[in-house]
């Protein structure tokens, strides 16, 4: 009861990654994905400090704020998120995203991409480049491909979506491709890395990309480049990352392997078999909170089971999902054999409709 919890966050609100793709299909206005931190303060008594942590002394238990203040801590939990590895995108940088949006965080980026889709002539080509693993929200690019295709089918049916991928496979691939065939025919073309999909160079001004080591040119009318990713900048600056660019942790407590009294959760953490998803991060936060409380009380860390659930919309009325249960075993988080699973490939139309409804319900519940 005497525990004081303070959250330092520079923004008064944020736009959730999950649900943002729905904006492209007109399912939900982007404003509905705007979330605040009011419930943490009003329901749970968390002190909210609108500032930015610029660094800390883990041994001394002191964090420095951009506004000049300091905060003392017994435990520091950081969620650095992601940053883009622009040095791996030849020809493009952060200054080009008004013309070639990534639309992978931040509300305005989603609006830019939506406006470009609306302005495109019927018969145009939307090119999306999907990043290499690991990255935030593994099914995200493929839900986006689906919902852009839905918009085009309704409004610009002569158009197509060309997806160029840095990988040879992706999350829920069989279910997505089944939905694409059923709903969109040949409107969507997905090109794997082995077949020449790996991004080589971008010309933002011309909205042109090259693949196959620069030998294959693709001209876009709308170009959406999702860059390679690594742990957020503060994690890089404060030495929380390893050579992979991500943050190694004790996967039982998410305590940093690099510094004492610091825990890392969310997309930036190396979390074993768990994906970089919103549901996973939510579970990690709860588990880490329980672990810290027990440690401060001198009690054993709980033997927690972790869960991930991810819904994706192939159309407003066609939902698919994956679920998994995880445990700590042999020093890392592993999947529990026989748990979870995918939506059945043979599901009928009513089941797909129900899963689309469940997706909306899941979003409303996790953001409540």
Task: Write out the residue ranges for each language-model feature.
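A Rossmann-like FAD-binding core segment of flavoenzymes
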Residues: 43-55, 59-64, 71, 150-245, ...
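FAD-binding core/adjacent interface of flavoenzyme oxidoreductases
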Residues: 47-143, 147-154, 224
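Active-site-proximal substrate-binding core of FAD-dependent oxidoreductases
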Residues: 274, 291-338
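Beta1-alpha1 glycine-rich phosphate/pyrophosphate-binding loop at the start
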Residues: 1-47, 132-174
């Amino acid at each position: 009861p005497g525990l004081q919890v303070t959250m330092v966050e520079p923004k008064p609100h944020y736009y959730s990654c999950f649900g943002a793709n729905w904006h492209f299909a007109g399912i939900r206005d982007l404003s509905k994905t705007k979330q605040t931190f009011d419930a943490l303060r009003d329901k749970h008594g968390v002190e909210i400090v609108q500032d930015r942590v610029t660094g800390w002394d883990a041994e001394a238990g002191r964090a420095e704020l951009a506004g000049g203040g300091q905060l003392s801590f017994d435990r520091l939990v950081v969620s650095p998120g992601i940053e883009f590895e622009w040095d791996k995108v030849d020809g493009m940088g952060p200054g080009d995203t008004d013309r070639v949006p990534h639309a992978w965080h931040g509300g305005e980026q989603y609006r830019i991409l939506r406006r470009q889709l609306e302005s495109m002539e019927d018969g145009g080509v939307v090119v999306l480049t999907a990043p290499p693993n690991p990255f935030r929200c593994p099914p995200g690019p493929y839900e986006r491909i689906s919902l852009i295709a839905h918009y085009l089918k309704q409004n610009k049916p002569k158009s197509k979506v060309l997806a160029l991928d840095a990988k040879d496979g992706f999350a829920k691939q069989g279910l997505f491709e089944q939905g694409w065939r059923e709903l969109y025919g040949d409107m969507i073309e997905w090109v794997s890395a082995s077949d020449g999909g790996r991004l080589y160079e971008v010309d933002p001004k011309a909205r042109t990309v090259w693949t196959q080591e620069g030998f294959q040119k693709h001209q876009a009318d709308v170009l959406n480049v999702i860059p390679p990713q690594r742990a957020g900048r503060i994690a890089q600056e404060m030495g929380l990352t390893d050579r992979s660019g991500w943050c190694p942790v004790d996967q039982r407590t998410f305590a940093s392997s690099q510094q004492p009294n610091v825990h890392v959760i969310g997309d930036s953490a190396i979390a074993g078999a768990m994906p970089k998803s919103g549901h996973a991060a939510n579970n990690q936060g709860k588990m880490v909170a329980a672990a810290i409380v027990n440690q401060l009380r001198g009690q054993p860390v709980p033997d927690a089971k972790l869960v991930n659930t991810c819904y994706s919309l192939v159309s407003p009325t066609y939902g698919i999902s994956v679920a998994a249960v995880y445990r700590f075993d042999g020093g890392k988080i592993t999947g529990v054999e026989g748990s979870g699973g995918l939506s059945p490939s043979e599901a009928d139309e009513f089941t797909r409709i129900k899963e689309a409804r469940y997706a909306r319900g899941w979003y409303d519940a996790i953001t409540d």
